């Protein structure tokens, strides 16, 4: 095991990057500003000539290292002469600087891995829709699935220790530890099962959270690649700055028990049909045949989180379900595997046979209730899904109102083009279309019926998507044929982000 540990340390970071001096370079904060977390916060302090100065950073670091300034009560922090109401401003500046410099080792390693694997031009691999054809090909042959929420209660020291494997600059890590202990409670707010980051400071803490997940998956991939008993192929590792996506096919199982000193005993059990996919704050894994290997994999995960990452996790929170009786809420879709039965009549001489064929089909539908909830929060409809007008848009011109509704409708249709059943999508388009009409009627102080007659049928044709227009041109007379083709699943490889209305979790 010492040999494995040495290999992990050697491959995490091959170079020592001196990052601490970069905190005092003003171009680092200009770079962070251009990345667009909060584009105005660095220029709202008129006392420093409208620019982020290295003097601010030096003074903040000096105060952080002083024992008296590390403890603030709720009243004293408001009246503090140095921090005062600008405490959030200074912490925002420093957090943006940290976020840029700690990403440097990861970015260099990412570019190196792309050059080594020669997949730099494979931009389609970063598409969200690219995962669904993979699931469609693989999940129809699987039997059991587990949908697991990744534990989020991560201790600060665990985060810093994780970065120690990648960043070898002791000064930066020491300052980061001071910074996190001082500002942790003001930056994140636990809510239900997910850690929500405050809008003013998401970048650094999202990076820390994803680096923790990356460390867990790095051990996972290391054990798979280094063991001769685990011969498998990986379909791709997507290493992004904010979100990391990993999809692995033909994964073989490893059972590992960790203790505090990272000593372990390995049992290798071959399972050529284990699949693992992570998305947002969850992951799911699926396997074929009996649930025995799923239970062993669950045991591995629980021990990994509890003994290596010091995160308490109850095994009972990982349920093993039959794939044919379970639906996955995944990236705006509700995915499931359904059995389609067909009876074939066969006759040989005087004997008649009825053959019942059961075929598995991967279905993806649009969950209408959560999507209507998102439309309700955006004031497009009420809680029952009835369209309403948007008073905030009545000050805009008619063309701007129509263009905005058309853009939202087409983006949703484009994202949900892979749905097996379009009925829910048609209902969403109806809500947006009628909400647009009601907004225009409210602006001109007319009834909806009068305004619809004024717009005519051409207005409703504008809400047709590109696919519907193309099919109507190819099959102008055979409406049933075009409708049957449009009902099929269409996956686009240019979708790299989730629509705000789709991301309702």
Curated annotation (Swiss-Prot):
Top-level taxon: Eukaryota
Cellular component aspect of the GO annotation: chloroplast
GO MF, one example: RNA binding
GO BP annotation list: mRNA processing; RNA splicing; tRNA processing
Entry keyword set: Chloroplast, mRNA processing, Plastid, RNA-binding, tRNA processing
Compartment(s) where it occurs, according to its Swiss-Prot or TrEMBL record: Plastid, Chloroplast
Entries under Pfam families matching the protein: Intron_maturas2, MatK_N
Family: Belongs to the intron maturase 2 family. MatK subfamily.
Cited function: Usually encoded in the trnK tRNA gene intron. Probably assists in splicing its own and other chloroplast group II introns.
Protein name: Maturase K
Organism annotation: Kunzea ericoides
